[in-house]
């Protein structure tokens, strides 16, 4: 019997091996189908792909669904095309339209993407726009291209209702009337990792953040500290990068424009079924637009106004750049990023006058401006076990901030008489400046788990997360000089310097260590098939450098009603906070001192939103009614930074999108109203420097039926009047002794941008013109209204190598 069994095994083994050898792998089936499709054997390709094993990797399934959709498109089988386009977007919600994708296929992707798109920011888990617990603005790569966007600020102010650009030493934003001197109330993330400074909370949404590597941007409008903690006061912006396998080669571009503007980008991507690599590099330089200002102009400031010039939007004497890498291997992901940005300040501080930028010496490789260089690395592990998903990460952030600030070419002013703001030798000299340097290192880790559950007819999921951050500020210094290059004073760490005429008041720069422990949870529960409860809270415990302990609770509760697939209604409440920055709590500047025990700012937000779609017209309408109450705003009261301000705002945000066969139109409109305020940059009716009415319209026309691969785009932005109150340091002449007395009205205005994009084989040609009609206008947000660039242009050549 044993001999017969052995003989049977020996005979069957070759047959089994032969059977295995003739069974093609999933990769071989896909390659065969691609070859058949390329030579027009569509039916054979379909037959091969219909037998594709569904257990293969998602990255391969994506290509299978794409190829099936293309095959059925060639057969004009609309039902099958729509089916596989939907499956493709389900596997890869971030699918990027390729150069060789047919126009009809690209239109179907665009028409279905917004409705089928998956979000990860709203709940830190995959979900649709319909089920997001708060109002979300989704900005795709095509939408970024449709406005010829150059900076993240331009993208956000165009597509996100309630966001308005502001001026200052760095690019700034207001959200629903809330802003500070730098952008530190909106949390900006790159693939979920914080980009805001850990010492100042600030991040400038300008050229230091490349857009070439971005696949989509998810914007949570409203308080979001329940998941993201500190800084997520008014909104969260998550930048989702492209995937290497979609880039599939090298992309390079070179741009040139007026005002000695140059920009270069490199993007490389490659991927297979268990690994993916994406690398990017972006470099930007611009002299900025130079305005020659006569001494009689309203833009000439100073105790004794003189003729001079200012540079607006200058980025030079170090250029601005963004370098990064994403590498995925199975369940592991590594992200590395290094960025630098330095913007030229139009005016000096202190007496707010024009200055000769080129006369000031280079210090640490920089001329005057606020420079930030930051580097971070994140190692992440993610896996799914049955109904539980686990995600763990470890990150390290290093930052070097250098503020090279000009006080004035000539400092003669009432300051000389009062002798209160500067040492004696400063008041009677020229070319006065100071340089502050901060270095800080932050490391930490985060782990979270998502558990799905089923309770009878009800289902949902539960999210639990823990986070730890360790912040260390070190090697901080302050230097002050005169005659454009001479360093007369240096203070490091906790050294002190006695200011003449100031009694015992001292200047110091503080080092220190701070720790933050966080725990957060969220539940998404389907009460009924059409009614969802989404709630959560976060607890943050912070130990400050002086051992003061901070405890913050951030709750959120949302009800989402989905009567059908075309309409939804959401009601939500959330509370958020932003802690007073480390630099504000430790950095004393002669006449301005931090109040002991400076506390976080808080925001309570109520929102009622609704979304409606009419698919035959590819029309989508979104409306959101909001009410916000901001408390503990940090303001300057009697030379002290203190928590004295509050602000109540309400408003209506609306957006509308049309998608026609060859025309895409998007518009948004915001009306916001100040209810009341205390000790804020506002009067009884207006928040200073922010309009009550904002409107944007964007249109992109595909001319492929007439001129293949040619697209035209246009944008019109309209803003109502604004009011501006001059800062404490502004002078308009020797008789102007009452600081901050002037309230000026800045008229309403509209700006028009146009552009075109043409593709030819592996090349793209793009031309964009901003402020087409060369309109003169000013933006507030700083101590004075600042002139903005007139008509500007930028031409781009881009090529791809696969």
Predicted segments, located by residue:
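Periplasmic-side early beta-strands and strand-to-turn transitions of outer-membrane beta-barrels
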Residues: 246, 271-362
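A beta-strand signature from Gram-negative outer-membrane beta-barrel systems
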Residues: 208-253
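Face-selective signature of the C-terminal outer-membrane beta-barrel domain
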Residues: 326-342, 370-547, 622, 666
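Short acidic/polar hinge/loop motifs at secondary-structure boundaries
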Residues: 165, 193-221
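Short strand-turn segments of transmembrane beta-barrel domains in outer membranes
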Residues: 236, 241-271, 276-281
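Gram-negative outer-membrane beta-barrel transporters
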Residues: 526-532, 618, 624-629, 642-727, ...
């Amino acid at each position: 019997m044993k001999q017969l069994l052995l003989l049977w095994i020996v005979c069957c083994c070759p047959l089994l091996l032969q059977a295995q050898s003739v069974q093609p792998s999933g990769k071989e089936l896909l390659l065969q189908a691609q070859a058949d499709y390329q030579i027009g054997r569509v039916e054979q390709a379909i037959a091969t792909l219909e037998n594709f094993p569904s257990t293969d990797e998602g990255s391969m399934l994506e290509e299978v669904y794409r190829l099936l959709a293309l095959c059925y498109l060639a057969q004009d089988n609309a039902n099958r095309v729509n089916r596989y386009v939907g499956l493709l977007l389900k596997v890869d919600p971030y699918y990027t339209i390729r150069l060789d994708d047919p126009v009809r296929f690209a239109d179907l992707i665009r028409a279905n993407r917004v409705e089928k798109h998956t979000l990860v920011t709203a709940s830190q888990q995959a979900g649709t726009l319909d089920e997001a617990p708060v109002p979300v603005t989704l900005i795709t790569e095509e939408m970024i291209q449709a406005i010829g966007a150059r900076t993240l600020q331009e993208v956000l102010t165009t597509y996100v209702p309630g966001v308005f650009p502001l001026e200052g030493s760095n690019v700034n934003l207001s959200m629903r009337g809330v802003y500070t001197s730098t952008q530190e109330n909106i949390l900006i993330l790159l693939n979920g990792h914080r980009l805001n400074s850990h010492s100042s909370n600030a991040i400038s949404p300008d050229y230091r953040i490349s857009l070439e590597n971005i696949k989509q941007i998810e914007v949570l409008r409203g308080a979001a500290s329940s998941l993201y903690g500190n800084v997520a006061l008014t909104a969260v912006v998550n930048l989702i990068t492209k995937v290497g396998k979609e880039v599939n080669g090298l992309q390079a571009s070179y741009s040139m424009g007026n005002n000695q503007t140059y920009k270069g980008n490199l993007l490389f991507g490659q991927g297979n079924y268990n690994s993916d690599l994406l690398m990017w590099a972006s470099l930007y330089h611009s002299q900025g637009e130079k305005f020659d200002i006569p001494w009689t102009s309203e833009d000439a400031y100073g105790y004794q106004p003189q003729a001079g010039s200012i540079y607006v939007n200058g980025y030079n004497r170090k250029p601005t750049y963004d370098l990064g890498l994403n590498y995925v291997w199975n369940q592991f992901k590594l992200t590395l990023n290094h960025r630098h940005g330095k913007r030229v300040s139009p005016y000096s501080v202190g007496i707010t006058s024009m200055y000769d930028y080129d006369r000031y010496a280079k210090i640490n490789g920089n001329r005057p401006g606020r420079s930030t260089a930051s580097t971070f690395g994140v190692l992440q592990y993610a896996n799914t076990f049955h109904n539980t998903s686990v995600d763990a990460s470890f990150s390290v952030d290093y930052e070097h901030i250098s503020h090279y600030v000009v006080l004035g070419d000539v400092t003669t002013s009432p300051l000389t008489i009062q002798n209160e703001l500067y040492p004696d030798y400063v008041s009677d000299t020229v070319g006065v400046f100071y340089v502050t340097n901060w270095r800080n290192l932050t490391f930490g880790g985060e782990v979270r788990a998502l558990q799905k559950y089923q309770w009878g007819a009800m289902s949902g999921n539960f999210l639990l997360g823990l986070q730890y951050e360790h912040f260390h500020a070190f090697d901080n210094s302050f230097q002050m000089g005169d005659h454009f290059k001479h360093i007369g004073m240096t203070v490091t760490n906790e050294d002190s310097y006695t200011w003449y005429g100031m009694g015992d008041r001292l200047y110091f720069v503080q080092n220190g260590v701070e720790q933050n422990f966080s725990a957060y949870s969220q539940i998404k529960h389907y009460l009924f098939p059409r009614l969802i409860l989404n709630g959560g809270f976060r607890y943050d415990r912070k130990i400050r450098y002086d051992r003061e302990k901070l405890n913050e609770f951030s709750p959120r509760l949302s009800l989402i009603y989905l009567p059908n697939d075309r309409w939804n209604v959401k009601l939500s409440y959330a509370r958020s906070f932003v802690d007073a920055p480390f630099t504000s709590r430790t950095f004393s500047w002669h006449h301005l001192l931090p109040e002991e025990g400076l506390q976080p700012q808080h925001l309570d937000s109520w929102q009622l939103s609704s979304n409606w779609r009419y698919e035959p017209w590819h029309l989508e309408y979104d409306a959101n009614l909001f009410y916000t109450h901001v408390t503990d705003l940090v303001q300057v009261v009697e030379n002290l930074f203190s928590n004295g301000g509050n602000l109540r705002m309400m408003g209506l945000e609306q957006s509308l999108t049309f998608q026609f066969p060859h025309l895409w139109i998007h518009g948004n409109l915001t009306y916001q109203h100040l209810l009341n305020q205390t000790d804020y940059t506002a009067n009884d009716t207006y928040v200073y420097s922010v309009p009550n009415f904002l409107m944007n319209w964007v249109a992109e026309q595909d001319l492929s039926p007439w001129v293949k691969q040619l697209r035209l785009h246009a944008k019109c932005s309209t803003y109502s009047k604004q009011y501006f109150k001059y800062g404490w340091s502004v002078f308009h002449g020797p008789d102007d002794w009452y600081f901050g007395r002037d309230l000026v009205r800045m008229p309403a205005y509209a700006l028009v941008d146009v552009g075109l994009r043409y593709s030819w084989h592996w090349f793209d040609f793009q031309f964009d013109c901003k402020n087409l009609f060369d309109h003169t206008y000013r933006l507030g947000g700083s101590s004075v209204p600042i002139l903005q660039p007139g008509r500007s242009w930028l031409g781009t050549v881009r090529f791809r190598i696969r």
